């Protein structure tokens, strides 16, 4: 099946007891069973079933299964937020003394999380420009995973997933990819060799800014060396499900990172239109980027779909004929960036991406407010930068709105 058909029918089960065509919301904290023996078996992973929503829930389970099918994995674990998913994805296999080698081009919240992990003895080494030689140079006997975003947010660099996965596997370590900005519509990282993929499903998967959530999907292919990953020893018996079995029965359960059934319900609805939304969003973003290049040579436009992008070729090779829904412009000064943002009538000034509506933000003063100057530079964050998450509006209206906002502003030199 093709992408949109698979979204609608690939893992659709409906509700067998009533014939409902939409996944019901099982708004229950716990689940009753006919005998103590049955509940004992569920707790010992000897029988399928639900016991407590902090561990699993039928509505959440339906969302997890649909994302698993979408990403081409063996199992998924849905979390209360994208940050909860990121933390759980990492700390499911890490312990004090372990090290991460990561792309330096990351969402500001991810950088903040890595800083918090230092208190637990987990160190992160950053690599500029996703340079494979630098990944290799920073890898040592303590390295336990590689991490990168498919499309860096907001730098918009594109990771060569296959090349990075091959390097990770040479060192017998897994590659975890954050696919939030690209989504499975553009690329399925597990099919290119990544071992684990996570998404902040609050963004494009949900698509309507009505819930916070994240999800982790495992390929089931990585062979866990219990000397490197001693916590996996008791879960090797689960075969390809070892990683998610450990996660659900350990860190995820014990940190209370569960997704609410209501938010899972919203995500199931949003997921069905991911393909048609992304088609429109990507096309609008490309047209808006070309508009800036054509009419405003005094601003620097960054979008992977432009031939001027350093990552255009790898994006063409890796993506499905489109290049994502985010672009950035450098305006010359923070003052001008604020003037443009404040003059816009259609886009919302919001710290989110992936909505049906166009969203704008000044990352340097918001999302990366806790980042050091070096971290901001490596992430492509400057004081004159505007990030634009393009929506599904008629692109002609967006262009006219940006034109009037740009024309009201005065070019100035940026401070770097």
Provide a role label for each language-model segment:
Residues 115-116, 124-125, 141-144, 335, ...:
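PLP-dependent enzyme catalytic core of the Aspartate aminotransferase-like
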Residues 266-276, 324-332, 387-391:
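Short, well-ordered beta-strand elements within core beta-sheets of diverse protein domains
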Residues 1-47, 415-416:
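N-terminal glycine-rich, Lys/His-bearing helix-loop that initiates the first secondary-structure elements
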């Amino acid at each position: 099946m093709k992408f949109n058909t698979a979204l609608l029918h690939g893992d659709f089960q409906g509700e067998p007891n009533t014939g409902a065509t939409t996944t019901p919301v099982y708004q229950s904290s716990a689940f009753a069973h006919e005998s103590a023996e049955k509940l004992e078996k569920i707790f010992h992973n000897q029988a399928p079933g639900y016991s407590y929503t902090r561990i699993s829930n039928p509505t959440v389970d339906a969302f997890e299964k649909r994302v698993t099918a979408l990403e081409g994995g063996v199992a998924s674990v849905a979390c209360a937020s994208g940050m909860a998913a990121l933390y759980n994805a990492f700390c499911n296999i890490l312990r004090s003394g372990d090290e991460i080698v990561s792309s330096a081009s990351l969402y500001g919240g991810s950088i903040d999380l890595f800083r918090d992990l230092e208190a637990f003895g987990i160190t992160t080494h950053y690599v500029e420009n996703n340079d494979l030689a630098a990944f290799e140079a920073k890898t040592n006997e303590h390295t336990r995973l590689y991490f990168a975003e498919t499309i860096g947010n907001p730098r918009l660099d594109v990771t060569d997933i296959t090349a990075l996965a091959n390097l990770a596997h040479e060192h017998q370590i897994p590659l975890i990819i954050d696919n939030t900005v690209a989504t499975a519509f553009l690329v399925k990282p597990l099919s290119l060799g990544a071992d684990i993929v996570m998404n902040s499903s609050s963004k494009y998967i949900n698509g309507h800014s009505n819930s916070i959530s994240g999800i982790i999907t495992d390929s089931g292919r990585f062979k866990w060396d219990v000397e490197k990953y001693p916590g996996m020893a008791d879960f090797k018996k689960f075969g390809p499900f070892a990683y998610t079995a450990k996660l659900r029965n350990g860190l995820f359960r014990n940190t209370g990172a569960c997704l609410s059934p209501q938010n899972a319900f919203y995500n199931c609805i949003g997921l069905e239109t991911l393909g048609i939304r992304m088609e429109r969003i990507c096309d609008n973003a490309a047209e808006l980027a070309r508009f800036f290049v054509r009419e405003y040579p005094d601003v620097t436009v960054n979008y992977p779909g432009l031939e001027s992008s350093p990552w255009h070729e790898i994006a063409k090779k890796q993506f499905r004929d489109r290049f994502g829904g985010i672009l950035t412009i450098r305006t010359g000064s923070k003052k001008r960036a604020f003037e443009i943002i404040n003059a816009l009538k259609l886009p919302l000034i919001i710290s989110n991406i992936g909505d049906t509506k166009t969203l704008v933000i000044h990352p340097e003063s918001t999302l990366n407010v806790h980042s050091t100057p070096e971290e901001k530079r490596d992430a492509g964050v400057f004081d004159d930068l505007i990030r634009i998450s393009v929506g599904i509006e008629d692109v002609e209206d967006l262009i006219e709105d940006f034109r009037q906002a740009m024309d009201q502003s005065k070019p100035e030199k940026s401070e770097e």
